[in-house]
């Protein structure tokens, strides 16, 4: 997200970044210190778990990027802490786009985990492929709740977009790696470094997929 903010400001776009706590300077300061932030960036409070909280931030915008998602592989209640909030979050943002009446396009960051997690692997994947949600729930491989949440959320997003004739694009990246601007390490890099740190749970994720550098995304 922080890289997206920087990349959007570079050609001159006015950017509204949403965070759960604008008063948390440890997390917000790196954004405010980016080149051009004083004139091109504003920080808005919004939370995927609070219905309608994105309405004001999106009002007046012409483009919206949805890049965040609840992620906790050690959740004791993944259904209510990850899966349902992910679905509700994307739909709430799409509703806010409709209310704004100014948004021309929504770009939604989905995941390669929405199409290639199946019992029978295929030699080729395309836009007609979906991960097998029931297979994920049954096997419960590392990160299964993430695969389920992103798959169901994207399916609901496409239904909503078709019903309301919204211009939506989904991006399907695998594990995203690269330098980071925030003071805490992103979850994707914790996974990427697992061969060094010895984190077996995260290492099992590496064996399931591929990488993409953020500059290529």
Swiss-Prot record:
It comes from the Eukaryota. Its EC number is 1.1.1.219, 1.1.1.234. Pfam families: Epimerase. InterPro entries: Epimerase_deHydtase (IPR001509), NAD(P)-bd_dom_sf (IPR036291), NAD(P)_dehydrat-like (IPR050425). SUPFAM superfamilies: NAD(P)-binding Rossmann-fold domains. Keywords: Flavonoid biosynthesis, NADP, Oxidoreductase. PANTHER family: DIHYDROFLAVANOL-4-REDUCTASE 1, NAD DEPENDENT EPIMERASE/DEHYDRATASE. This is Dihydroflavonol 4-reductase. It comes from Medicago sativa (Alfalfa). The gene is DFR1.
């Amino acid at each position: 997200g922080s890289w997206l903010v920087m990349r959007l400001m570079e050609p001159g776009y006015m950017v509204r970044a949403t965070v759960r706590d604008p008063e948390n300077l440890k997390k917000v300061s790196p954004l405010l210190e980016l080149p051009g932030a004083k004139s091109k960036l504003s920080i808005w409070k919004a939370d995927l778990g609070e219905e309608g909280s994105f309405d004001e931030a999106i009002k007046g915008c012409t483009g919206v990027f949805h890049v965040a998602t609840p992620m906790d592989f050690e959740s004791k209640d993944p259904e209510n802490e990850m899966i349902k909030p992910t679905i509700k979050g994307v739909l709430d943002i799409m509703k806010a786009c409709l209310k704004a009446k100014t948004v021309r396009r929504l770009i939604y960051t989905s995941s390669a985990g929405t199409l290639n997690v199946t019992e029978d692997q295929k030699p080729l994947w395309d836009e007609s492929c979906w991960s097998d949600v029931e297979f994920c729930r049954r096997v419960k491989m590392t990160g299964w709740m993430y695969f389920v949440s992103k798959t169901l959320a994207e399916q609901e997003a496409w239904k909503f977009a078709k019903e309301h004739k919204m211009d939506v694009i989904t991006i399907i990246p695998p594990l995203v790696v690269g330098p980071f601007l925030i003071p805490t390490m992103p979850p994707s890099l914790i996974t990427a470094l697992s061969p060094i740190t010895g984190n077996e749970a995260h290492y099992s994720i590496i064996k399931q997929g591929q990488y993409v550098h953020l500059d290529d995304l």
